[in-house]
From Swiss-Prot:
Entry-linked SMART domains: B3 (SM01019)
Name used for this protein in its record: B3 domain-containing transcription factor VRN1
This protein's UniProt keywords: DNA-binding, Nucleus, Repeat, Transcription, Transcription regulation
Protein's job: Essential protein. Involved in the regulation of vernalization. Acts as a transcriptional repressor of FLC, a major target of the vernalization pathway. Binds DNA in vitro in a non-sequence-specific manner.
Lineage per the UniProt record: Eukaryota, Viridiplantae, Streptophyta, Embryophyta, Tracheophyta
Signal peptide: none
Outcome, altering R289E: Reduced ability to bind DNA. Lost ability to bind DNA
Length: 341
């Protein structure tokens, strides 16, 4: 008889609230079986009693949950798999930021490199961070002696990558705010993250001219038909990983520019990102600064260099695909307007 599973990705709110919400779909099926507390059994043999809080047809792991989190050093970005054994008992498997199952005997701080998921779609994407999947227990990978584990060949070793089984289709991002045209005024209360050392000085026409030179050079006379062909070609490409599409505008192509990313994608996958990520085209990677703030994410430093070196211009469509490797990587597939002229 198949056993039900659900997974939870740990967010900052999970840590702050010191509790974990049980997925609604699981609750709707099994709430009558759950008592006032559950037993969480981890592969090291420890059994943790965690109290449940029930309200408005919702259930949280609460009393005792923080002690469980502390014991295994569970952090933001960790992935927890809960296999329901019946009678308010769960088997719990914990995967860390390097996508490996943790070493339960060292409080989760060390990798257990050989305990990886095989590349398989074990999860379904559900709304509100909830997921519930029912599979035979033989599908679920259990800890094995190192000598019995096959070599890591022919499949991705990223456990979390298997979580991303469906695309995120996003509309064209919010236009980049225009640069102020007035001279001699300093922007008050400016967000320090908006400041870029490569931006032009308003009181220097020569600098301002050079600032837009690169964008002008790549500004094309693109007909609506040509643009539509590139967009339609991009729409036929749907990676299995989460992705979004961006149609490049001149405002995304000058030195010092900022490009905002679709909010739906940002909220789901970029929350907490503040620093350099890797953007990959073909076999080469470029460092690009990505900042998430108040539900929005943007590219700044490094983005211009990426577009310049790859000769990306107005009207080109970029499909950004999230690869969950050890580093945070967005793989780019470019559909160029000049290929459809």
């Amino acid at each position: 008889m198949p056993r039900p599973f659900f997974h939870k990705l740990i967010f900052s709110s999970t840590i702050q609230e010191k509790r974990l919400r049980v997925p609604d779909k699981f609750v709707s099926k099994f709430k009558d079986e759950l008592s006032v507390a559950v037993a969480l059994t981890v592969p090291d043999g420890h059994v943790w009693r965690v109290g449940l809080r029930k309200a408005d047809n919702k259930i949280w792991f609460q009393d005792g949950w923080q002690e469980f989190v502390d014991r295994y050093s569970i952090r933001i970005g960790y992935l927890l798999i809960f296999r329901y054994e019946g009678n308010s008992a769960f088997s719990v498997y914990i995967f860390n930021l390097s996508h490996s199952e943790i070493n339960y005997h060292s409080t989760g701080l060390m990798d257990s490199a050989h305990n990886h998921f095989k590349r398989a779609r074990l999860f379904e994407d559900l709304e509100d961070e909830d997921a519930e999947v029912i599979f035979p227990s033989s599908v679920y990978p259990s800890p094995l002696p190192e000598s019995t584990v096959p070599a890591n060949k022919g499949y991705a070793s990223s456990a979390i990558q298997t979580l991303f089984t469906g695309p995120v289709k996003a509309e064209e991002p919010t236009p980049t705010p225009k640069i102020p045209k007035k001279r001699g005024r300093k922007k008050k209360n400016a967000d320090p993250e908006e400041i870029n050392s490569s931006a032009p000085r308003d009181d220097d026409p020569e600098n301002r001219s050079k600032f837009y030179e690169s964008a002008s050079a790549r500004k094309r006379t693109v007909t609506a038909e040509e643009r539509e062909r590139a967009i339609n070609a991009a729409k036929t490409f749907e990676p299995t990983n989460p992705f979004f599409r961006v149609v490049l505008r001149p405002s995304y192509l000058y030195r010092g520019c900022i490009m905002y990313l679709p909010s739906g994608f940002a909220e789901k996958y970029l929350s907490g990102i503040s620093g350099f990520i890797k953007v990959q085209l073909a076999e080469k990677q470029w460092p690009v600064r990505c900042l998430y703030k108040a539900g929005r994410a943007k590219f700044s430093q490094g983005w211009y260099e990426f577009t310049l070196e790859n000769n990306l211009g107005e009207g080109d469509v970029c499909v950004f695909e999230l690869l969950r490797t050890r580093d945070f990587v967005l793989k780019v597939t470019a559909f160029r307007v000049n290929e459809y002229v």
